[in-house]
Amino acid sequence: MAVKNMTKKQVQIFFERLREQRPSPKTELNYSNPFELLVAVTLSAQATDVSVNKATDKLFPVANTPEAIYALGVEGLKEYIKTIGLYNAKAENVVKACKILIEKHNSIVPNNRAELEALPGVGRKTANVVLNTAFGHPTMAVDTHIFRVGNRTGLAIGKNVLEVEHRLVKVIPKEFIVDAHHWLILHGRYTCIARKPKCHECVVADVCNWPDRFEFGAARSIAVKNIEAEL
């Protein structure tokens, strides 16, 4: 059975519930300024936040500015991030990005997409994370967790990440859009997981359109039926 798109009311309830569950959502990457966030997100491609944090917890006390990391050089940076996947390419990209930040941006992380995506190793998703998390832009970075949640629940159905991103930006109410990335990624990481999703403990199971949710423990309660009737 195909998943149906959520109604506006379902979307509203969906995010009200996620907000109640996590009033102040935030990234699980450790950072203290926009540059540290940029580096951490760049390193996080095809790596876990836990593995990135282990590396940056040692790196940032030593080098957390473009000048300091550029001074380390590629080989020096590798020593700090060699436990992370694709560390060779990532080290080269980060050092090149630092050089550009120093020469073109006075060592300040740009607050716009075009200049961010011009940095080596920075694609649309990384730019979206930095714009949203560091600068409060209403952008939506779609990773594997958010792609799954969007398609599974009916919140944002799309064949690729760009389709899901555009759909999310379109349907999410303005009051939720700035925090939506964090809510969705955390929901996908801990509840709406790829295998054996925890529908039995999901706070939005009653507004989810995934046909199989009841097989994974979503309650068929009177409250659920009442909400579904309202929708």
Task: Label the predicted regions.
Residues 3-228:
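Catalytic cores of DNA base-excision repair glycosylases
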